[in-house]
Amino acid sequence: MPGVIMDNATTGRPGHAPDTQTPSNGDNLRNGSFHINGAAKGDKDHDPDKESYAGKPRIDGHRALPEIPHITQGFFPFSTLVNRSVQQCWNELSDLITELAAIHVSPHSSVPLLPVNGKSPGNQSPENVQKKLRILDFAHAKRAEFIKLLVLSQWSRRARDVSKLIDLQNFIRARHQAFVDALQRVGEMKRDLVQAQVANPDLQTALEILSKGRLESLADLGYKSSKLLTARGALRRLHKINRIISARLALHDLIPHPFRTYRVHDGRVTFVVRGEFELDLSIGAESELSQFFFVDIRFLYSPSSNIPKGRMSNEIDAKINEKLRDSGLTGCFNFLHGLVLTNKIHILFKQAIELAKGLWSETLRVELLHRTLVIQYWTLKPGPKSWIEIGVKSGNGDADSQGLGVPCLGLRWMRDGQEVNSRDIEFDPEDLSMECLLRSVIALHISYLLSSAYGILSEYSLFSSGTLSSHAILNVTEPGECQLSVQLTGSRHLRVSIEPMSGAVILSATPGLLERFESDASLDRSTIDDLVARVSRLRCIAAIEELESNVRILGFETVSPKGLRNDIRKVFPANVLRFSLFWHPLWERNWVVAATSSITSDNWWVVRLRRSSEVATDFSVSDTSVPLCSGHSMSDTFLATSHQTRSSSFPDLGYCLSGMVAIYANVSYLSDLHSVEFHPPLCALKVESDLQIPDIFIRYQVSNLPRALQLVLPAGLKRKNLLKDTVRLAFHGIDRHKNSAIFVAYGNLVGPWTDLCTLISKSDSSLVFKQGGSGFALRLLAPAGRPVIVQLFKSLQTLECTLSILDFLRQRRLTPQSLSLTHIAFAYGPGRDLSATIEMGLSEVPSSAELDPVRVLARTDPLLCLTLGIRFKHPNPHRRVQGSLAAILNHASNEAGLDFVTEVLSFTLPLMRALEQITSNASRQEPFRLQVIVRNAYTFLLHYTYQGFRFQLTTRQHSGQLTWVLRELSSPEAGPGHDQFKARLRGTLYHSKGNGWKGLGNGVVADAEGVSNVIRALDGCFTGAQHNTWLPRETKSEQDYSTQPAPENQSQTGAPSQAGMANDTKMTANFVNDKSLQRNPVVSNAADVITID
């Protein structure tokens, strides 16, 4: 019994060792010595798993019975289990401690919780509760495991009796198996002895047969020979059989639907299946339950042959009779129908092989896959392949099958790699001809190609208007009669046909015309697209040559396509056969316009050529899927020709094309973004009849912008929809000084705004507000061909942010002074004598590659981030906390932000003015006496270096309102007169009170206005305390407290470290809850004040 736990200390009786235990009953004496978990003394060779011993002679001389084998396999000491459980508990406890240490527990909220039942609830944050639950679950689990160990310990004290029971059970099982094996062997022996038995010879029967030649004991069956059947009798019997068959078929047998056509004659029934076979069956008994028997079969399709006599005929005869016996007429039909279908497929296969070896050599490919015949035609033709498949098709729901659920031969036509309907293919299942089938398929294929080409040509304006004519002759059975005739000019015609066997296109025209354009055509193309391209090219030659001569007069330069590294032909549609490129000196080199001519119309195109450096930077050379140029048709007529008679045609056309290049770049960018609605769409972007450049109307909604283009605002600044959702982007010419296109975005504000025009600086030309209205205009500059959409969205969102800040300042009754897209200046203070500037800094505009629409849509992180800053000029006292206020503006918490900054300015103004007054040293003759370290806007450290005193000034909630608390911090070194200063501080501050402040015994609490009195009183306690050796000490103190963190004991007594100070500010003031207030160090202008943010 594996897994038995033995406790060595308690296996035997109490007080006895296991190996010295003696038997206490007669059984043990009869079986010899009793051993536990081992051999007896003096036994050296024993099995560690099973131990047995031969019997020893007893006193009376007889051998004793053998010892029962003792089982020790699977036993292990109980101490091992205890040790492993303890080790596992220790390991899991270590893992639990590591896991709990990784869970960050948020500190207590600054709002104190009321005690419940006289006990403090403690920290009830989710993280802390989770930690407690994990500890409790671990304790419960380990408690249950050790309870199990206790139960096992109690059970192991009785393990000796269980071990005896195991040994006894093993002995009984061994004896039982021995009895079973003995019975099995006896049975096998008895079975083998049967083969050894030999019957006794029957000598009497053998003697009678040898002597008389017969055996009298055998019975005579009394068979009589039949009479000869006469002609009349045979006819009578045949009529009787006909009646029996007719009655049976009409009343009893289930006839399948294909066997409904039959006739009864000559003692047999003939079933006729049209196009397949005739089957003759007869009966062998009058009973209606007897089976039909096969007589003969004849095939009704050609080519076919009778079944040859011999082995094949016998096998088919036996197989049909078996089907009639087992499945009746239905099983017989299914067997013969499948046999016929398979035979037809093999006949067609042989015919296809003969064709592939004859006239259709190298143009056919034949494969037989099980019962599916595949014939591929036009094998030498490049491109998608075409083939037909002939196989057995299920007849379920098929009207063409011979009956419901009856399979039949089916065709599957794959034309140019795509499956098409095969109902028009001429295929006779009764007269099998693979050549006729192929001719029908190829004729339908050729008819499809020529009719498609005819349809394309008929849609062109030249043919639909009747200027040119075309007609097609089609045939569904004979491919040689299919042809297409096209009128090229008034006197020239072209006839197109396709060779049936190879699929090659044959063009028949006048020799001169054919030689001229066969050289331009590709030899690999064999579809009707070649014909359309060649016919279209004829008309395009004269149109382009005339256009080039007219445009050169207007001053454009012709660009040769061979000098471009880009394949310019890929830009235009396939029907454009002739084109010419032009460039203007005012444009960038990567932009050209193209005049194209096709069989449908003449067009001006704007084409952007990608530079080779762009390709090398963004895309690999081997990537052929990336377009190297792009273009758009912007007119349906040649504008140069229509304006060539005007003297000002060149400036008008140059302005028009320059505007189209600039507008097209922006519309194309909007089209690639997909999420922004605009008008007109890219496909409808056209030059108007008077050469006016169309404007772009954009629906501006921040929620519809891609994630990467949405401006990320600080958490404290709420996004407001202050602009109407329609913005008009217009082209306003070219700035020749900057060689850039000028765009103006016109929009309207949601509500009325006053005095916006007065706040805009006259030197800022990028933003203009309408006088007395809600309209505004943004001026944008970009090189011609570079989109300004990202710049537009950034400016619009920045404008909304600027207006939101302006609206907030007015709600707080602060006085705005100036306004732009980069800053807002305002005045604050009791007399509005102080000014501050909120700066709006945007992240750097990414490169052109990063602003690609595909990359913009794929990005999940924003590209545009707004960072607010605040700037104070000298002598504004708040300049010392400028960095901390800027961090609050950009804090990740929703509680921080502009609202919080305005409160900070109001709350800290008295303090900052008092510190500014004390630390100012205009003459620079008085030595430094006070060092101020600004941790953040709500935490200050005041250090009197000479006297050796350090104070911490922080905010606390006192009597339900935010107050200033001044506490003295321990100093590593005491200065001269330390006790006198200490007594002066107690009398003046700690045990006193004044206007707006009150002593606390070990500190001072003051409101926002009274803190200035506290600072002045504190400074008065140290006024005049100077020392001649203060400079070295100040240098050492400045190094200790300005560049190094406070010691650990000081952090516990009231001088926390930089990170701890930020956390303490968060808990007490409930305004700032992150360490981000400790960034961007800003040093004040006074040399005796150090600011650490």
From Swiss-Prot:
Molecular function in Gene Ontology: transcription coregulator activity
One GO cellular component term noted in the UniProt record for this chain: mediator complex
Disordered as annotated region, ranges: 1-62, 1034-1065
Localisation per UniProt entry: Nucleus
UniProt key word Nucleus: yes
UniProt GO BP: regulation of transcription by RNA polymerase II
Coiled coil segments of this chain: none
Swiss-Prot/TrEMBL keywords: Activator, Nucleus, Transcription, Transcription regulation
Skewed-composition ranges (Polar residues): 19-31, 1040-1056
Residue stretches spanning the membrane: none
One of the Pfam families matching this protein, by short name: Med14
Source organism superkingdom: Eukaryota
InterPro entries membership: Med14_N, Mediator_Med14
Biased composition (Basic and acidic residues): 41-62
Primary role: Component of the Mediator complex, a coactivator involved in the regulated transcription of nearly all RNA polymerase II-dependent genes. Mediator functions as a bridge to convey information from gene-specific regulatory proteins to the basal RNA polymerase II transcription machinery. Mediator is recruited to promoters by direct interactions with regulatory proteins and serves as a scaffold for the assembly of a functional preinitiation complex with RNA polymerase II and the general transcription factors.
UniProt record similarity statement: Belongs to the Mediator complex subunit 14 family.
Self-association state and partner proteins as the record states: Component of the Mediator complex.
Protein name listed in UniProt: Mediator of RNA polymerase II transcription subunit 14
Lineage: Eukaryota, Fungi, Dikarya, Ascomycota, Pezizomycotina
